[in-house]
UniProtKB/Swiss-Prot annotation:
HAMAP family on file: PSRP (MF_01062)
EC number annotated for this UniProt entry: 2.7.11.33, 2.7.4.28
InterPro entries on file: Kinase-pyrophosphorylase, PSRP
Protein name: Putative phosphoenolpyruvate synthase regulatory protein
Job of this protein: Bifunctional serine/threonine kinase and phosphorylase involved in the regulation of the phosphoenolpyruvate synthase (PEPS) by catalyzing its phosphorylation/dephosphorylation.
Pfam families (UniProt xref): Kinase-PPPase
Family, per entry: Belongs to the pyruvate, phosphate/water dikinase regulatory protein family. PSRP subfamily.
Keyword Ribonucleoprotein (UniProt): no
Keyword NADP: no
Catalytic activity of the protein: [pyruvate, water dikinase] + ADP = [pyruvate, water dikinase]-phosphate + AMP + H(+); [pyruvate, water dikinase]-phosphate + phosphate + H(+) = [pyruvate, water dikinase] + diphosphate
Length: 258
């Protein structure tokens, strides 16, 4: 079966409707979906252009969080398959509350300040990626630790982009693991440390794609590093998440809850 192109249309960043679309589409694992986010569709010209783009795309679906009915109409009038967050949810909420909804143009999260906070968190995650700028670790909400390629960077960026959390990440190198002690840069920050680990075979496959045939990518090397890292984290009572069968969304949700 051919896949579907899924357009996530929003009058702001598109993060909310993209998350909704991913959650819904995950219920259909046998079908392939390609997500395209169309953010900041906040006037008629942009809505017409976006609807036109979708209309010429084969097997297209639209998930929309447009708050303005006039903008939503461009997609409906084009005869597209539209799944609209506000059109389906808001009327039900209005009936319960006895209060009409007021379109807020993307301010569903207090967006102006919230958006700035998320972008600041993303910049922080990039500045403190892979052990960079350890002198600023004290500013982090969470510090992700683990051996190379266990998913620290994408998880830190997801936490920043979706939750506004300032997440740093710090690699545990073979030299660190040989010392049987936490790297000095991490020692003052124990309450904020969170460990990530993987099945050795999964880690080896990820590393093999980066450095084929290397010792770094061997299952034996991966198992040795992971075992040493897990012992080190356990010795310091640092919470550890096995990400082998988890999506980055699930990992981030677990970390946020912690």
């Amino acid at each position: 079966m051919n896949g579907y192109s899924v357009f996530c249309v929003s009058d702001h960043t598109g993060l909310t409707i993209e998350a909704v679309a991913k959650s819904v589409l995950a219920q259909f694992p046998r079908i392939e979906f390609s997500l395209i986010t169309l953010p900041f569709i906040d006037d008629a010209a942009k809505a017409r252009a976006a609807a036109g783009r979708v209309a010429v795309t084969a097997r297209a679906l639209v998930f929309s969080s447009l708050t303005d009915p006039a903008l939503r109409a461009h997609f409906k009038d084009a005869g597209l398959h539209v799944f609209d967050l506000f059109e389906h949810v808001s009327p039900a909420v209005e009936r319960v509350l006895g209060e009409p909804a007021t379109p807020s143009g993307g301010h569903t999260h207090g967006m102006a300040s919230d958006y700035e906070a998320r972008m600041d968190a993303v910049n922080f995650a990039l500045r403190l990626d892979d052990g960079l700028s350890p002198e600023h670790l004290g500013q982090a909400d969470l510090i992700l630790v683990g051996v190379s390629r266990v998913g620290k960077t994408p998880t830190a960026l997801y936490l920043a982009l979706h939750y506004g959390l300032r997440a740093a990440n710090y690699p545990l190198t073979p030299d660190d693991l040989a010392n049987d002690g936490l790297p000095r840069a991490l020692q003052p920050h124990l309450p904020r440390l969170r460990g990530l680990t993987l099945a050795p075979e999964r880690l080896a496959a990820i590393r093999e794609a980066r450095l084929p045939g290397s010792r770094y990518a061997s299952v034996a090397q991966c198992r040795s590093e992971l075992d040493a890292a897990e012992r080190l984290l356990a010795a310091h009572a640092i919470p550890l998440i096995d990400t082998s069968r988890m999506s980055v969304e699930e990992i981030a949700a677990r970390l946020r809850a912690s």
